[in-house]
Design a protein with these regions (language model features):
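Hydrophobic alpha-helical transmembrane segments of membrane proteins
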Residues: 1-75, 85-216
């Protein structure tokens, strides 16, 4: 199993460059938005939300990558693997390290651009950029792409395209109702443990379904 994990990590290592655009694209979006707010002299308190928005975008992009890896690479590599657990663990670790790398790059870029912005707009303190993000949110965001990938790939394996479409419409519904659940989470960040716990339980089911996936 250890050999399979190491082999999988080495095989996927060339794809680590994908963490760069996954991190920098949201940072650029946030930077443009911040400059527009500064130029129009709107309420600087709006800047408090921007890093959170950028982090969400980065995590969403990493979730997409996690789904792609577990839905496409897992069935492909399963044909050459004697250890399903090792293969699944290797892909999950690869997704995790890519997400952590993207978060680090995004955090460094945001701080660097925040320092530059502070030079031009002194009333926007750099420290305010991180006031709205609790510390425990970062590790939660790091594991989200792994959990989402396991759920999505597991549902596709167990229920086929029908299950995938159901998840897709549930995701769309969640995005359109963001105004109803984002404010409670922003006011009480600890409540994030409930949806994450439910997602983790579904991810366990997804992993079990992947363990029973047929070799194509």
């Amino acid at each position: 199993m250890k050999r399979m994990i190491s082999a999988c990590l080495r095989f996927e290592a060339p794809d680590l460059w994908l963490a760069v655009p996954a991190a920098l694209f949201p940072v650029l979006v946030v930077e443009v938005t911040a400059l527009m707010i500064a130029a129009t002299e709107d309420d600087p308190e709006a800047l408090v939300l921007l890093p959170g928005v950028g982090m969400i975008l980065t995590v969403v992009l990493c979730c997409v990558l996690g789904v792609v890896y577990l839905c496409s690479d897992f069935p492909l590599l399963l044909q050459f693997s004697a250890s399903r657990r090792g293969l699944l663990a290797g892909l999950c670790l690869h997704i995790l390290r890519m997400t952590v790398l993207a978060e680090v790059i995004a955090a460094a870029a945001t701080m660097a651009l925040g320092a530059v912005n502070h030079g031009f707009f002194p009333r926007f303190a750099v420290g305010e950029l991180w006031r709205g993000i609790p510390v425990f949110v970062w590790p939660v965001c790091a594991v989200l792409p792994v959990l989402v990938g396991l759920v999505w790939a597991g549902v596709l394996t167990r229920f086929g395209r029908t299950g995938g479409w159901v998840l897709y419409f549930l995701l769309i519904g969640g995005c359109f109702s963001v105004d109803k659940w984002l404010h409670p989470l922003a006011e009480q960040p600890w409540m994030v443990v409930f949806p994450v716990g439910m997602l983790a339980a579904l991810a366990v089911c997804g992993a079990k379904w992947l363990m029973k996936a047929a070799v194509k």
